[in-house]
């Protein structure tokens, strides 16, 4: 019976040692996994931070370039419209001056024609003066 008790104690110790060993291995595995995951998370956080900084830099450069282009385009458009407006005003003034001159000449010609017509009409009706 004592041999059986000794054997039971040995098996109990063996089981306890196996449980302790399994606990240690599980703890080591979980510690290693936690450390690995923390390192991965740290790397991902660094990569994400770098990506965010690059994105902000790229966005800033893009917006700066776009703003510069749009300002240059607006200035060119303003210059074009200013020149167009000046040309339009000059052309309008020239047209109005030419039209006024032509109408004045036409009015003078009509006036002379009507005076001559009137003289001729009086001459034909009343005879020569």
Swiss-Prot record:
Residues 19-117 are annotated as: 3 X 33 AA tandem repeats. It comes from the Bacteria. Keywords: Gas vesicle, Repeat. It is found in: Gas vesicle. Sequence repeats lie at residues 19-51, 52-84, 85-117. InterPro entries: Gas-vesicle_GvpC, Gas_vesicle_C_repeat. Coiled coil: none annotated. One of its GO terms (cellular component) is gas vesicle. Its main location: other. The keyword Repeat applies. Belongs to the gas vesicle GvpC family. Confers stability, involved in shaping gas vesicles, hollow, gas filled proteinaceous nanostructures. During planktonic growth they allow positioning of the organism at a favorable depth for light or nutrient acquisition. This is Gas vesicle protein C.
